[in-house]
Amino acid sequence: MGATGATGPTGPGAPETFAYIYNIGTVEDIPLDGLVPFSNNGLIVGGIAHEPGTPEILINETGIYEITFMVQGDRVNQFALFLNDDLIPGTIYSVGAANIQNTGRVIVSITAPAIISIRNHTSFSPITLETLIGGTQDQVNAAVLIRRIS
């Protein structure tokens, strides 16, 4: 067996831009085309910013992002992701029953600075985000996970 060769160059590290942002507490009657607010910030690292209680999420780093969202409404609904007030194609997700998690996911190219939001896009009516579903503690009724992948 011969000698071990030289160590090659270190590859690129994983992107260090990601965020978990969520809502706890009732949100009454999000109107058609209304924005979903987020009461809390989880871990936010890198070029993403959010002010608790607001619906807009600021992306400060250009790149390719994986975005997953969840909304739990009080009736059948359709929610979608928007980038700078434009619908992101392929992100209208729906559920056909009340109090079920409506979950969507997309990979999208974002040029910073940009604003991401979730909207009650094409539901039949206003949607309420309720609490105390299935138990005695307030649960997360809307959330978004954003991860820069390149």
Residue ranges: model-predicted function:
Residues A3-S150:
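Extracellular jelly-roll beta-sandwich "head" domains, especially the C-terminal globular C1q domain
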